[in-house]
């Protein structure tokens, strides 16, 4: 059985993949409390299921490997007003738990840069 994490709003309440991945981890932790033989999902596992795992359904997507479609978000977590110096992995984790569209500075789909959605809407910066 192949499982992935997707953002089908009809089946959930947000198209934000970072929030869907975090919710998957949280729900798996609750499940693990009642089913000791089923370990909780880790954030790296959820990240895989939301990226490269999706390729099991949609083809060569979800990875920066040669031959894959370049679909990516460029995120900036430096505006969070953090007191700590964080590694790239820690910044990615921070985006999954605390980030939103204000942290996304560029979007790419099939190698093409996408325009910012709703550019006329100016949101208050975090921090």
Regions found by a protein language model. Give the residues of each.
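His/Asp/Glu-enriched, well-ordered alpha-helical/loop segment
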Residues: 1-81
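Short secondary-structure boundary/hinge segments and terminal tails
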Residues: 13-14, 85, 125
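C-terminal cap of metal-dependent C-N hydrolases
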Residues: 69-119
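Intein/HINT protein-splicing elements and their conserved insertion hotspots or analogous self-processing inserts
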Residues: 117-127
């Amino acid at each position: 059985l192949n499982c992935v994490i997707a953002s089908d709003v009809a089946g959930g309440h947000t198209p934000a993949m970072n929030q869907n991945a975090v919710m998957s981890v949280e729900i798996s932790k609750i499940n693990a409390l009642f089913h000791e033989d089923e370990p909780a999902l880790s954030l790296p596992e959820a990240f895989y299921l939301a990226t490269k795992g999706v390729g099991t359904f949609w083809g060569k997507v979800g990875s920066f490997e040669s031959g894959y479609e370049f679909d990516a978000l460029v995120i900036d977590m430096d505006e969070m007003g953090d007191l700590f110096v964080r590694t790239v992995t820690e910044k990615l984790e921070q985006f999954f738990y605390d980030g939103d569209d204000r942290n996304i500075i560029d979007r790419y789909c099939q190698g093409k840069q996408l325009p910012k959605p709703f550019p006329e809407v100016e949101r208050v910066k975090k921090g």
